[in-house]
Design a protein with these regions (language model features):
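Short, structured segments at the rim of ligand-binding sites
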Residues: 1-345, 350
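Polybasic/polar functional segments that serve as interface/processing modules
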Residues: 353-355
């Protein structure tokens, strides 16, 4: 989800020299937890209104504990903040909602341990945990180096390491080892955000390797794009009810996975076009079924599943097994809601969810 972009920019701004301005940030529980966690680490963040728009002003500086950080059930917070906290002096404790204790975190913890950070997790490799980088007291940076990480359960594992790499002594070269890497567009977003802040990043996708060099980050003045994935339910209304819906400020060029909605919904029968000020979607006479690999855009699955339940032909939504490990089991929830839709309408739910 696009809250990861807000969280990534907050994280990089916390490491940068000067004060960054993040305009039009997405306000959600995830982003609020990230801001609260950064403040616990001593980061100065001011929330203001400029020309009618919300602005976060984030001033980089020395990170320090001790601190107790609530991650809620936010994947970005539980995976992005512990690596950042490893740059801080003092003991940092992390905990969250009961569901957060069940969500995968092991690859991030193991990577931090390889980097020399002490992480106390009771052998569970999950929350709750405390960490401390004892070398920080002596003025030493995390050395960095080559890390192998299995990010097949979440691309956030990889992004979390890349985001702190500029603040290490020799940078980080991260190699993904394991199954297919999900949500590649989110990693592309991380790389672009790093470059926006002045980091040097080399990418070799064939070798599943990302190299981020050490170096100073420079404060930025950024406009955060609207969350395109969140537009999916509203775009679906036009397809289900007829008529048109316009989404304001849809960017013509973006790395967001949600931009694939334009192609996907067109294949399902919608008419979609850019107009002045946004993107207009008009429903067709019928909703068409679709056979599609959603591995890179799993967050779109609930909306596509709902439309598929109302389609005139079967749909096959593939490579979405990793969604069982999100804030909720999104596959089970999608099955529940499409079944409810079937029981409350004369239409047959033709959705087949591939449980890989």
């Amino acid at each position: 989800d696009w809250s990861s972009d807000v969280c990534s920019s907050d994280l990089l701004a916390a490491q940068a020299e000067g004060t960054s301005k993040l305009r039009r940030p997405l306000i959600s529980r995830d982003s609020e937890l990230m801001v609260a966690g950064l403040k616990q680490l001593g980061v100065k963040i001011e929330d203001s209104i400029e020309n009618g728009e919300q602005v976060f002003s984030v001033t980089g500086g020395k990170l320090k504990g001790p601190a107790k950080i609530d991650v809620g059930n936010a994947g970005t917070v539980m995976r992005f903040l512990p690596p950042l906290a490893s740059l801080a002096e003092g003991e940092i404790a992390f905990d969250g909602d009961p569901r957060s204790h069940e969500r995968p975190l092991g690859p991030v913890i193991k990577a931090l341990e390889e980097l020399g950070v002490t992480v106390n997790h009771g052998g569970r490799y999950s929350l709750p945990l405390t960490l401390e980088n004892k070398g920080i007291k002596e003025g030493k940076k995390i050395r960095g180096g080559e890390i192998e990480i299995d990010a097949s359960a979440s691309s956030q594992f990889l992004s979390a390491l890349l985001l702190i790499a500029p603040s290490t002594e020799i940078g980080i070269t991260a190699k993904h080892v394991g199954g297919a890497l999900p949500s590649m567009p989110h990693i592309d977003m991380t790389v672009q955000m790093l470059r926006d802040f002045g980091a040097e990043v080399q990418v070799d996708k064939k070798a599943n390797t990302w190299r981020v060099a050490p170096g100073k980050l420079i404060a930025q003045d950024l406009i955060i794009e609207p969350d395109l994935s969140n537009a999916a339910p509203f775009m679906s209304i036009a397809m289900v009810c007829g008529g048109s819906v316009t989404i304001a400020d849809w960017p013509k060029q973006t790395t967001q996975p949600g931009d694939q909605l334009r192609e996907i919904l067109t294949r399902m029968g919608a008419n979609i076009q850019f107009i002045e000020g946004g993107l207009k979607i008009t429903g067709g006479e019928k909703i068409k079924g679709i056979d599609i690999d959603l591995h890179d855009v799993g967050e779109l699955t609930p909306a596509i599943a709902t439309l598929s339940a109302l389609a005139e032909s079967p749909s096959y939504l593939r490579e979405i097994g990793h969604l069982r490990l999100h804030e909720t089991d999104r596959l089970s929830r999608s099955e529940e809601h499409t079944s409810e839709l079937q029981s409350h309408s004369d239409l047959v739910c033709r959705l087949l969810l591939e449980k890989k």
